Design a protein with these regions (language model features):
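Structural motif marking the loop-to-transmembrane transition
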Residues: 1-2, 350
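Carbohydrate-active catalytic/glycan-binding domains of CAZyme proteins
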Residues: 24-354, 358-361
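Short, solvent-exposed mixed-charge patches
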Residues: 364-365
Length: 365
């Protein structure tokens, strides 16, 4: 009942409340020209032709750099480069696992962040020595690498399965890594979102990670997954997190909000997804991030669908997002008008509530 009341409160608060964006583009003052021996910018592929999961876009030097699961040739991490978000050169390997590297597969979800003059790759791999997935940090002087691991193995706890690390800089300038503690290594098999302070050179955590929330905290989600965290501050200074789980229609993008604007300040959850398969969108999708394009538009990048089939394959999707000051809305949805938006959100809420009620009945009968 407590979760249902919290959900109803969040629903009334949904259209006008809630959180924030990522870092602005760096390298504005010059044009980054990739080495033609490394990548041929004249040979491109359309976004829709590229199979990729967990896409992450860095804007630097008037170029877009798209990293993601499946972009590398062989063990490691890869990147595509574009000038218009439609035609992509590459991919090029930004990190290739050398002989003796501890990785044993699961080269997932690389994110590239420009910080204090260096490029940092936060990325997941499966460790040969621990047989756990974890997040490591890699550093380079170029967004195209080569990147070198600087953490001496996973930075996340060795006895956890951890994935999808992302960077957040708080109001005091303190860097944090927010990451997934996978359901595969939690006591109750429910995934959690975790965070830890980073030291100045991103080589280690300062203190132990803290749990932020669990996958089943939002009443409308029925999965045990916490995927793809991304932090954003709205124009009014509200701290928001995008992340992914499953509702009754499949993979989707959730919004959660800090109660006091701090990472560890406690989190509450919107009762409707930012993106989900519904009467407006035909395909599921998730593992989202935000960036500002070269025209100043706030865009959400995610992969959709969540699983390839004979007719569709996983690819990067870019959707314009509106920062309402307290929350985020998809521009396509916002154009529908308030009443239609409320109708879609309420329909989603009722469908998920009915699905939860049916599950509850099955459990007690």
């Amino acid at each position: 009942m407590k979760r249902i009341l919290s959900a109803l409160f969040a629903f009334t608060f949904l259209f006008g409340v809630v959180p924030a964006e990522a870092s602005a583009s760096d390298g504005e003052g010059f044009v980054f020209e990739p080495d033609p021996g490394l990548i041929d910018m004249t040979k491109t592929r359309k976004t829709s032709d590229i199979t990729i999961r967990d896409p992450f876009v860095l804007v630097f030097g008037q170029k877009y750099f798209m990293y993601g699961t499946g972009a590398a040739a062989g063990p490691g991490y890869g990147c595509y480069v574009s000038e218009d978000l439609e035609n992509w050169a590459g991919p090029v390997n930004v990190f290739t696992a050398p002989d003796g590297f501890d990785g044993n597969g699961c080269y997932w979800a690389p994110e590239c962040h420009y910080y204090n003059g260096n490029f940092y790759l936060f990325a997941t791999y499966l460790s040969r020595s621990t047989m756990r997935r974890g997040v490591s940090v890699f550093r380079s002087q170029s967004p195209l690498g080569p990147f070198e691991e600087i953490t001496g193995g996973h930075i996340t706890p060795f006895d956890w399965d951890s994935i999808d690390g992302t960077l957040y800089i708080d109001g005091d300038g303190q860097p944090w890594m927010v990451f997934v503690h996978e359901w595969t290594s939690t006591v109750d098999n429910i995934g959690t979102m975790a965070a830890a302070k980073l030291n100045g050179d991103f080589t280690a955590f300062i203190g132990d990670p803290v749990e932020l929330f669990k996958a089943d905290d939002p009443v409308w989600l029925n999965g045990k997954v916490t995927d793809g965290p991304f932090l954003y501050k709205t124009k009014n200074g509200r701290l928001l997190m995008l992340w992914s789980n499953f509702n009754s229609q499949g993979y989707c993008v959730a919004r959660s909000f800090s109660r006091n604007g701090e990472i560890t300040g406690g989190w509450y959850h919107g009762v409707a997804p930012l993106y989900a398969k519904n009467g407006f969108f035909d395909l599921e999708g998730g593992h989202a991030m935000l960036f500002t394009d070269l025209d100043g538009r706030l865009l959400m990048c995610m992969h959709s669908p969540n699983k390839s089939s004979e007719t569709v394959h996983e690819t990067a999707v870019f959707l314009e997002v509106v920062d309402t000051g307290n929350s985020l809305e998809l521009a396509q949805i916002r154009q529908l008008g308030l009443f239609k938006r409320l109708a879609i959100a309420f329909s989603d809420f009722l469908r998920e509530a009915a699905d939860r009620f049916r599950s509850w009945i099955r459990d007690i009968v």
